[in-house]
Amino acid sequence: MLLRLPGTPPQPTPECKSVSLKRDCLPYLLCAILLAAAVSMMQLGLSPALTRQFATDTTAISQQVAWLLGLSAVAALIAQFGVLRPQRLTPVALLLSAGVLMSGGLAIMLSEQLWLFYPGCAVLSFGAALATPAYQLLLNDKLADGAGAGWLATSHTLGYGLCALLVPLVSKTGVAIALIMAALFATILFTIVSVFIWHYRTIK
């Protein structure tokens, strides 16, 4: 047992964080669902979108997809070491930036110009790399770390499941870029939720 020395101020009581989910945690979980769904639909939508340039040349399409996914990984690493590790932005700023970058990247990828797929995919991946740490830090302010990580993992799984449910429906449209458009819609919703989070935290 440790006793406080005479004349020393009492230590502040550490804040006790909740382990149960509250209503004000839902926007962060919705961001996680939308992010997972958007990235999954983008990756699944690359091959159909590239048929506009390569028709049925599956070898060329596969090569382009490999290059695009490799570029995505590089962009994510740049975001990690250039923005996240130096902690250049606050979590809310990261969240807003992620929404804008992901939406912008997917909007660029709607073009039929093949070369635009590369900057579009890089911008999207850069933004996606900013998103997860942002809402994880914000959620950790409200929940115990273990509880927050568990809920986010569940939300990501729900996002992948949502993507799996939407892919057959979206693909029925027959539009080559249908999945890219669906991913863009998800990132726009992500941005709207991010603005709501920013507004809520500002007025609180």
Segments and roles (model prediction):
Residues 143-175:
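A late C-terminal transmembrane helix in Major Facilitator Superfamily
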Residues 64-87:
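Transmembrane alpha-helices of Major Facilitator/SLC transporters
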Residues 22-42, 122-126:
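Pair of pore-lining "gating" transmembrane helices in MFS-fold secondary transporters
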Residues 93-107:
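Structural signature of the two symmetry-related core transmembrane helices
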Residues 129-143:
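Intracellular juxtamembrane helix-capping segments at the cytosolic ends
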Residues 5-31:
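Juxtamembrane intracellular "pre-TM" segments in multi-pass secondary transporters
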Residues 1-12, 192-198:
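C-terminal membrane-cytosol helix-exit motif in multi-pass small-molecule transporters
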Residues 44-64:
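Short amphipathic helix-loop junctions that connect adjacent transmembrane helices
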